[in-house]
C-alpha cells in the first residue's frame, strides 16, 4: 500500500473485443472527414486496477475503453468503440483542421504507476504526416476521483491549436437511459438537461456542419460560470461528476457529442435505436478542450476529474466547491455592498445624445430611493458619449454638468446615507473615437485570420438605434496589455477620488474569446480571462488605499472572479431559474434582479425566493422610484426589505438550499425555496413561499424532521405564530416567509 491506495496491476489479455460486448470499428474523424475505412481488428486489452475503478485500455492505441467504478458500482463506458484519450490539432499550411487522434496512434508505452497508468506516445501520425509531438497521458486515482492529465512536447515551429483530453466516450446513461439527467450549469440555466434523451447539438458556428455526429460546445469562462457538469439518475440515486480542475485560468470548452446522430422533431427520445444506428457505435462522448497555440515548448493541462457519487447534482456541487476552496478564497465578511438589500439604477444620457438627467438632479433622485429603504444608487450614462458610447473615456460628460458638479453630486448622495455606485467597463472601446483609432486599436482583440474586430452595440435613443441599424459600436480590447490596464486604472482611481464608493463593471462576462493580437504578452486563450481578473486584482487594493470601503459589483458570474466582486449584475425576468446550481454552489454569491417596469412584482418576489438584490430601474432606467406608476412597486420592495432584514441571517446571508429540507403542497403557480444558516451549529431554517399566479393560492408547508411553532411573515402584515405543518393563504403575486428557529422549541 502507498498513501492508502493499492498499487495498480496491469494485465495483458489477448482477446477479441466480443469479450466486452463488441468489435472495435476504427472510425477516424479528422475535421469531419473519414480518413480510414471502418475495420474490425483483434485488439489487446490492458486492464488497470486502481483503488477506485478498473480501467480497460486498448493495447494498441492506449485509448480508455472501459471504466468500472467499484463503489458505487457503475459501468461508466457502455460502448468501448467510442473510447478515446485525446485529439490534437497541429495546423499545417493549407490544412487548418490537421487532427491527430489517439485512436489512430500506436502507443509507445503503457506503464503502470502506483495510482494508475501512464500512456506515452513518442510521435503522432495521421494519413498526411508523422510529427515529432510527444504525448504523455496520465490517468490516476486521487482521493475519490479519477484524474486525467496530458503533457504535449512540441519541438516544431507550428502551433498546437486544440487539445481535447479527459475524454469519456461511449456513455449511455445510468440505469434507464431515459431516466438519466444531465446538468451543465450556467448562471441561471441548465445548458444541457437532457443529453441522454433529448440531445440537442449544433448550438455553435455552423451547427453540426463539418462532422458526421451531433455535438455542442460550452465555453468556460463564458456560458459556463463553473468548470463542472454532472450526469445523474435521481430514481437510482446515482450520478457522476465530470470537471475541469486545471488551476490555469484560460478559455476552455466542454465538448459533448452524440454518436452516430440524433433525431430532430422527436417527441421524447432523440437518440437513434440500435437498429437505426446500423451497427455504428452509439453513445455520448464528453471531453475538455484547450486552445494553447504553443510551439517550441511543452503544453500541460489537467486534471480533468471523474467521480461517481450517490445522489443528484447537489452532491456534485459540493464536490466542486470542496475543490474550489482548496485553491480560491472567497469566504470573507460581507462588506457594505454585499449587505445592501436594494439598489436603484438610473441612466443620465444615452448613446444618441438624449439627456435624461443632469448631475445636479442626482441627490434628489437618491433621496427618493432612500425613503423606500433603497440605499445604493447606481449611476449610468454619466461619462463621455453616454451609456455604451465613447468608452473607455471615463470622465464626466460635459453635457450633464461640470466635473465639480459631478463630485458635489456624489458627496451629496453620500451625505444622505446612500452609496454612489458608478457604472463602468473594462474590456470595451468605442471604435468611432479618435482615442481608439490613435491609441487603443493596438490592444484590440484580433481574429485568427485578420485583425477582425468583434463588434457590440446597444442603441437606446432612436428607433433605428434600438433596432440595430444606427447604433454605436464598441469592440473588445484586452487588459492583458499592461499599458491598457494602466490607462484604465488611472481613470478608475480618479473616480474613487471623486467620491465613488464602488463600481459596477459591466459586460465583464464577455470572456470566451481567443485573442490573436501579436502584441499580447500571453497566449490567445489567456488574454481576456486573465486580463480582466488581473484588473480586478489590481483595482481593489489601489482603490481601497483611497477609500477603504471601496467595493465592486460586476456583470460577471465567472467563479474565479468571486474573490473580487461582491454582487453580480444580472437580470432574471423568467418565472424560474432553470438551474440554481451556481447559487447553490456559492451561497456567499448574490446578484441583482431587476424591476424595470411598474408591473415587475414577480421578479421582486423571485428576489426574495433566491436571495437576490432588488434593483429598481424605473421605466427602463429613466425615472425616480417615486414616480406615480412605480410607487406601488417601490412600496412593495420596501416591505420585502423590512422582512428580509428581520431574518437576514437566513434569507440573505444564509445558505440557499434550493428546495431541499422542506416540502410545499400548493397550486401550479406556487413556488418555494429553503434557506439554512451557514453556521453549522444552527438548525434554524426558513422557507419562502411565492404565489406567482393571478389568483389567491393556499399552500401547506412541512419542514423535514421538524415540528412545533414557527413565525410567518408577509408584506403589509404583522408577523404571526403558527404550528407545523402550516397552511398559508398567499394573495396573487405575493409571498410569505416561514421561519423556524431552534429557540421556538
Describe each region flagged by the PLM:
Residues 605-683:
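Aromatic- and carboxylate-lined catalytic core of secreted/periplasmic carbohydrate-active enzymes
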Residues 21-32:
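Bacterial N-terminal signal peptides
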Residues 435-474, 478-480, 530-631:
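Glycan-recognition surfaces
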Residues 39-49, 53, 73-120, 135-142, ...:
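Polysaccharide-binding surfaces and accessory modules of carbohydrate-active proteins
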Residues 721-745:
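C-terminal beta-strand-rich structural cap/linker in extracellular carbohydrate-active enzymes
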Residues 47-49, 155, 211-336, 359:
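Beta-strand-rich recognition/accessory modules
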Residues 227, 231, 237-241, 250, ...:
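Carbohydrate-binding surface patches
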Residues 340-489, 500-502, 510-523:
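Aromatic-lined carbohydrate-binding/catalytic grooves of carbohydrate-active enzymes
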Amino acid at each position: 500500500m502507498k498513501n492508502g491506495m493499492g498499487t495498480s496491476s496491469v494485465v495483458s489479455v489477448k482477446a477479441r473485443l466480443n469479450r466486452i460486448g463488441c468489435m472495435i470499428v476504427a472510425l477516424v474523424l479528422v475535421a469531419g472527414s473519414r480518413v480510414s475505412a471502418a475495420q474490425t481488428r483483434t485488439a489487446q486489452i490492458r486492464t488497470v486496477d486502481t483503488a477506485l475503478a478498473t480501467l480497460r485500455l486498448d493495447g494498441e492505441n492506449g485509448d480508455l475503453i472501459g471504466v468500472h467504478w467499484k463503489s458505487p458500482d457503475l459501468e461508466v463506458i457502455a460502448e468501448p468503440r467510442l473510447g478515446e484519450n485525446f485529439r490534437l490539432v497541429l495546423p499545417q499550411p493549407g490544412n487548418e483542421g490537421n487532427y491527430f487522434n489517439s485512436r489512430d496512434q500506436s502507443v509507445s508505452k503503457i506503464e503502470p504507476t502506483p495510482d494508475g497508468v501512464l500512456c506515452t506516445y513518442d510521435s503522432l501520425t495521421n494519413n498526411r504526416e508523422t510529427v515529432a509531438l510527444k504525448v504523455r497521458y496520465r490517468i490516476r486515482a486521487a482521493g475519490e476521483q479519477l484524474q486525467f492529465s496530458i503533457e504535449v512536447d512540441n519541438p516544431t515551429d507550428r502551433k498546437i491549436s486544440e487539445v481535447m483530453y479527459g475524454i469519456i466516450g461511449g456513455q449511455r446513461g445510468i440505469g434507464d437511459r431515459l431516466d438519466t439527467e444531465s446538468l451543465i450549469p450556467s448562471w441561471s440555466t441548465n445548458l444541457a438537461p437532457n443529453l441522454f434523451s433529448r440531445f440537442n447539438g449544433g448550438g455553435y458556428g455552423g451547427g453540426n456542419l463539418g462532422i458526421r455526429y451531433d455535438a455542442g460546445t460550452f465555453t468556460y469562462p463564458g456560458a459556463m460560470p463553473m468548470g463542472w457538469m454532472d450526469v445523474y439518475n435521481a430514481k437510482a440515486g446515482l450520478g457522476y461528476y465530470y470537471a475541469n480542475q486545471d488551476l490555469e485560468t484560460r478559455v476552455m470548452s466542454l465538448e459533448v457529442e452524440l454518436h452516430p446522430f440524433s433525431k430532430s422533431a422527436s417527441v421524447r427520445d432523440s437518440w437513434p435505436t440500435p437498429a437505426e444506428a446500423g451497427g455504428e457505435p452509439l453513445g455520448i462522448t464528453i471531453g475538455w478542450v484547450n486552445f494553447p497555440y504553443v510551439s517550441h515548448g511543452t503544453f500541460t493541462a489537467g486534471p480533468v476529474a471523474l467521480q461517481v457519487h450517490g445522489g443528484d447534482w447537489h452532491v456534485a456541487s459540493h464536490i466542486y466547491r470542496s475543490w474550489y476552496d482548496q485553491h480560491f478564497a472567497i469566504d470573507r465578511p460581507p462588506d457594505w455592498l454585499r449587505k445592501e438589500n436594494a439598489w436603484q439604477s438610473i441612466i443620465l444620457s444615452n448613446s444618441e445624445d438624449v439627456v435624461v438627467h443632469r448631475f445636479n438632479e442626482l441627490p434628489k433622485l437618491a433621496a427618493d430611493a432612500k425613503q423606500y429603504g433603497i440605499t445604493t444608487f447606481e449611476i449610468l450614462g454619466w461619462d463621455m458619449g453616454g451609456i455604451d458610447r465613447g468608452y473607455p473615456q471615463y470622465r464626466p460628460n460635459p453635457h450633464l454638468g461640470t466635473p465639480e458638479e459631478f463630485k458635489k453630486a456624489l458627496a451629496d448622495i453620500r451625505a444622505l446615507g446612500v452609496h454612489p455606485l458608478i457604472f463602468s467597463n473594462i474590456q470595451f472601446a468605442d471604435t468611432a473615437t479618435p482615442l481608439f483609432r490613435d491609441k487603443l486599436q493596438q490592444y484590440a482583440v484580433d481574429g485568427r485570420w485578420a485583425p477582425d474586430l468583434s463588434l457590440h452595440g446597444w442603441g437606446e435613443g432612436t428607433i433605428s438605434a434600438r433596432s440595430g441599424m444606427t447604433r454605436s459600436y464598441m469592440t473588445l480590447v484586452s487588459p492583458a496589455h499592461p499599458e491598457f490596464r494602466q490607462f484604465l486604472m488611472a481613470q478608475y482611481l480618479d473616480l474613487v477620488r471623486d467620491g465613488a464608493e464602488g463600481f459596477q463593471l459591466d459586460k465583464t462576462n464577455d470572456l470566451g474569446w481567443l485573442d490573436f493580437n501579436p502584441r499580447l504578452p500571453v497566449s490567445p486563450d489567456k488574454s481576456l480571462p486573465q486580463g480582466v481578473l488581473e484588473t480586478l486584482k489590481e483595482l481593489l487594493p489601489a482603490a481601497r488605499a483611497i477609500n477603504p470601503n471601496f467595493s465592486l459589483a460586476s456583470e460577471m458570474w465567472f467563479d474565479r472572479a468571486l474573490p473580487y466582486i461582491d454582487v453580480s449584475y444580472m437580470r432574471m425576468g423568467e418565472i424560474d431559474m432553470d438551474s440554481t446550481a451556481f447559487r447553490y454552489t456559492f451561497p456567499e454569491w448574490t446578484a441583482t434582479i431587476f424591476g424595470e417596469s411598474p408591473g415587475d412584482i414577480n421578479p421582486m418576489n423571485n428576489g426574495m425566493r433566491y436571495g437576490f438584490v432588488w434593483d429598481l430601474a424605473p421605466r427602463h432606467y429613466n425615472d425616480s422610484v417615486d414616480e406615480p406608476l412605480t410607487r406601488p412597486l417601490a412600496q412593495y420592495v420596501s416591505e420585502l426589505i423590512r422582512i428580509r432584514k428581520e431574518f437576514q441571517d437566513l434569507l440573505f446571508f444564509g445558505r440557499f438550499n434550493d428546495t431541499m429540507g422542506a416540502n410545499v403542497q400548493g397550486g401550479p403557480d406556487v413556488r418555494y425555496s429553503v434557506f439554512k444558516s451557514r453556521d453549522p451549529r444552527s438548525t434554524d431554517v426558513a422557507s419562502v413561499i411565492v404565489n406567482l399566479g393571478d389568483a389567491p393560492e393556499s399552500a401547506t408547508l412541512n419542514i423535514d424532521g421538524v415540528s412545533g411553532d414557527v413565525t410567518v411573515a408577509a408584506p403589509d402584515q404583522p408577523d404571526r405564530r403558527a404550528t407545523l405543518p402550516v397552511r398559508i393563504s398567499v394573495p396573487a403575486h405575493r409571498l410569505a416567509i416561514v421561519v423556524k428557529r431552534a429557540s421556538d422549541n
